[in-house]
Amino acid sequence: MSKKVSKNVAKARAAVEPRPYTLQDAVPLLQQVKFAKFDETVDLTMRLGVDPRHADQMVRGTVVLPHGLGKTKKVAVITTGDRQKEAEAAGAEIVGGEELVEKIQKESWTDFDALIATPDMMRSVGRLGKVLGPRGLMPNPKTGTVTNDVAAAVKEIKAGKIEYRTDKTALVHVPVGKLSFPAEKLIDNAMTVITSVVRAKPSAAKGKYIKGITLSSTMGPGIPLDGSVADAAAKA
């Protein structure tokens, strides 16, 4: 890291006081301390009071961001027959059947942001776990990416639908837009995600569920949010 960047990082961090912020204050502050020359992604990180080693405490879900992510996702669909035409008409960039499964398997090819499959193709798609799993691309009925209604699934993803899940350390990382977005849109997207995660609380989770929330950008500092954000989400 160059001295100039180091100075910028230090200056940005110094602008964040050692206290929790409201979401309404955190977003403008993150935009104010921007120094990168590219349009950074804004990320939300939530620390949850769950033990992800237990399947009944795994938090996983999907949410459609009201203002999208500022980029169009490339969608692939594995299906057959007329549903291939439906997927293409809905805007899927990559559509195929067994030949697409074979390409992904042989070449470890994942030049797409989301993958949808129809139930009849899951026996074949199941062979792709080693390629798709580590990249978070494996279709799953719980996230709506295993479905016969491929057109609706493609449109949802194009509209800003994203998937989230806890990692091994009980953190959920979710992008909520670009730093160039108006503050109101970033706030709306962030609240939509927080509300979804709050509602996804497993019944097996005991004690405090939302242990901490941090807002950050690609190059910017992490800004801790206060408990009122989660409280508001719980009432939404």
UniProtKB/Swiss-Prot annotation:
Could you tell me what this protein is called?
Large ribosomal subunit protein uL1
State the organism named in the record.
Answer: Acidobacterium capsulatum (strain ATCC 51196 / DSM 11244 / BCRC 80197 / JCM 7670 / NBRC 15755 / NCIMB 13165 / 161)
Which molecular function term from Gene Ontology is one that the record holds?
A: tRNA binding
**Transport among the record's keywords?**
no
State the function annotated in the UniProt record. Answer: Binds directly to 23S rRNA. The L1 stalk is quite mobile in the ribosome, and is involved in E site tRNA release. Protein L1 is also a translational repressor protein, it controls the translation of the L11 operon by binding to its mRNA.
Q: Which Gene3D superfamilies match?
A: 3.30.190.20, 3.40.50.790
Lineage at the top is: Bacteria, Pseudomonadati, Acidobacteriota, Terriglobia, Terriglobales
What PANTHER family does the annotation carry?
A: 54S RIBOSOMAL PROTEIN L1, MITOCHONDRIAL (PTHR36427), LARGE RIBOSOMAL SUBUNIT PROTEIN UL1M (PTHR36427:SF3)
UniProt cross-references to SUPFAM superfamilies, sorted A to Z: Ribosomal protein L1
Gene Ontology cellular component annotations, sorted alphabetically: large ribosomal subunit
The subunit structure is: Part of the 50S ribosomal subunit.
* Recorded family membership: Belongs to the universal ribosomal protein uL1 family.
**Coiled coil region boundaries:** none
Task: Name the domain of life this protein comes from.
Answer: Bacteria
Tell me the keywords, alphabetical order.
Answer: Repressor, Ribonucleoprotein, Ribosomal protein, RNA-binding, rRNA-binding, Translation regulation, tRNA-binding
Q: Name one GO biological process term.
A: regulation of translation
